Regions:
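Intracellular terminal tails of multi-pass secondary transporters
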Residues: 1-63, 70-71, 230-261, 265, ...
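Helix-to-loop junctions at the C-terminal end of transmembrane segments
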Residues: 98-111, 329-343
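Extracellular/lumenal inter-transmembrane loop segments of multi-pass membrane transporters
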Residues: 70-85, 110, 128-140, 148, ...
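Conserved MFS/SLC helix-loop-helix module at the cytosolic interface between two early adjacent transmembrane helices
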Residues: 97-137
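Extracytoplasmic
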Residues: 46-82, 99, 103, 188-192, ...
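Structural signature of the two symmetry-related core transmembrane helices
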Residues: 114-128, 346-361
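Residue-level signature of mid-helix packing/kink "hotspots" within the transmembrane helices
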Residues: 63, 93-101, 151, 186, ...
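Extracytoplasmic gate region of multi-pass secondary transporters
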Residues: 66-67, 270-335, 390, 422
Length: 496
């Protein structure tokens, strides 16, 4: 019994506020708050910017097909026949879906420094090749290969950051890099408007013009940055090149004390089961699924929706920029507040209501100016949801292996929302797209109720654990087995 009490006392989490002037580690290592703040500042400058840039390129190469569509792609490759364009979008997410979990397991084994840039170079090269496609079938193949490389990017980057940051620090950082998705929408609209104007160039049958310029130059930029990324990207806190020896020890120990797990543990089937059987992960995955219907749908179809407001192609590209900029700033602000207040579900519920208002206006209002205002509501309301659900799942997963599987698992199920999104706005439903707006409105209502459920579930579990109703899980376990309980440990507390 004494051993059990000792182990439990060592495990207590205190929700991310453990290691300020700590001296109870195994090796007696202690540090001050000032040292930890300085360390976190260094990590911020060396990890967050590179991940943000890489994810911006990832999302840019994913959604540029929406910009290319109104610059002649659909007409030249006969994508307006039936639902061909929707199949081109779907094939990407179908492949993407099956890549995420295996990719994160590989990442855990080989490390992120070269693996993540490898993925970036891969999808950048595929984007360049898309510029030379001359048929519907060729475009399908290109999008499938894009899914192979992009599938591991988002969950991989989330796991990478979780290896450097404590639970209470994570959402703000994930919020910054995932906000690159909305910035890619803004940046993509500006780039597309400019690149499409470049005069035709190339040789023989490999002529590049209009929509082909979009794929070629955006892909080329991605490849160049991907090749340079390993110079800047660290592998893990224990070997980070920008930290001195003491800082490396602090960076490693502060995470070990919070999660009470072995940082170098190998992924096993037990970790996979623990991640996939967690009720909270199901909640976050379903929420991510519903959010993705909106975010992925808007990212690809916004130029088309705006073009149906009677804007010409160039104006439609440019008018998509301001809503994305607002969404980006909003996502970062909410991520910051969420980390400061250690609340996740509350902000998800509030912003779901904002998105609901926007989709209600788009569904039932006629005036184009009012509907354009509604675009701001839906982007600001929906875009913060993805990083919030992902961070919420990672926050409530203990141990690097479980976090790796959890992040990939949540994004994998969420990717099904991306598949659904490709069928929400079909050509026959335009120009008002009532069915697409109705589906998204229903999805945001679902997000609201899932956020409320997640809060109540976490509060209930924390209350039961505080009352000793989960202490039976420690019976018959030695210290090492107790450390591997993860989120099931009686002293683990969920972030709400």
């Amino acid at each position: 019994m004494e051993q059990s009490e000792k182990t439990e006392a060592q495990y207590v989490d205190r929700q991310g506020d453990l290691s300020r002037s700590d001296s109870d580690g195994v090796d007696g290592l202690s540090w001050t708050k000032e040292e930890e703040d300085k360390l976190r500042h260094k990590i911020d400058w060396h990890c967050v910017p590179i991940v943000t840039v890489l994810y911006l390129l990832c999302f840019l190469d994913r959604i540029n097909i929406g910009n290319a569509r109104i610059q002649g792609l659909a007409t030249e490759l006969d994508l307006n026949r039936g639902v061909r364009f929707n199949w081109v979008l779907s094939i990407f997410y179908i492949i993407y879906l099956f890549v995420e979990v295996p990719s994160n397991i590989i990442l855990k084994k080989v490390g992120p420094r070269f693996y993540l840039p490898f993925l970036v170079v891969g999808f950048g090269f595929v984007s360049m090749c898309t510029a030379f496609v001359h048929s519907y079938e060729g475009l399908l193949a290109a999008r499938a290969f894009l899914g192979v490389f992009e599938g591991g990017a988002m969950p991989g980057m989330a796991f990478f950051l979780s290896c450097f940051y404590k639970r209470g620090e994570l959402l703000f950082r994930i919020g910054i890099y995932v906000s690159a998705a909305s910035m890619a929408g803004a940046f993509g609209g500006l780039l597309a408007a400019g690149l499409a104007q470049i005069p035709e160039w190339g040789i023989a049958s490999m002529r590049i013009y209009a929509w082909r310029n979009i794929f070629f130059f955006e892909g080329l930029l991605t490849v160049i940055i991907g090749l340079l990324a390993p110079i800047w990207m660290p592998t893990d806190p224990a070997t980070a090149y920008f930290l001195n020896e003491r800082e490396r020890r602090i960076a490693t120990e502060r995470l070990a004390r919070e999660h009470k797990s072995h940082p170098d543990e190998r992924v096993s089937w037990a970790h996979v089961k623990r991640a996939m059987l967690c009720i909270h992960n199901y909640t976050c995955a379903l929420g991510f699924f519903l959010i993705n219907i909106t975010v992925q749908g808007l990212s690809v179809f916004m130029p088309t929706i705006l073009a149906d407001f009677n804007y010409d192609p160039v104006k439609a590209q440019l008018m998509s920029v301001p809503p994305y900029v607002c969404a980006c700033l909003g996502a970062i602000a909410i991520a910051y507040l969420s980390d400061k207040t250690k609340q996740r579900g509350l902000y998800l519920a509030i912003f779901a209501v904002i998105a609901m208002i926007g989709f209600a206006i788009l569904r039932w209002h006629q005036d184009s100016d009012i509907k354009y205002m509604a675009i701001y509501f839906v982007t600001i309301g929906a875009f913060p949801g993805g990083p919030a659900f992902l961070a919420w799942a990672i926050n409530n997963s203990a141990g690097p292996s479980v976090r790796a599987v959890s992040s990939a698992y949540v994004v994998t199920l969420g990717t099904i929302g991306g598949i659904v999104s490709t069928w929400t706005y079909i050509k026959e439903d335009g120009p008002r797209y009532p069915n697409g707006h109705t589906v998204n409105l229903a999805g945001q209502i679902g997000v609201f109720f899932l956020a409320i459920f997640g809060i109540l579930y976490c509060l209930r579990e924390n209350k039961l654990r505080a009352a000793g109703k989960r202490d039976h899980r420690l019976e018959g376990l030695n210290e090492d087995e107790t450390l591997h309980l993860g989120y099931r440990h009686p002293s683990f507390r969920y972030i709400t």
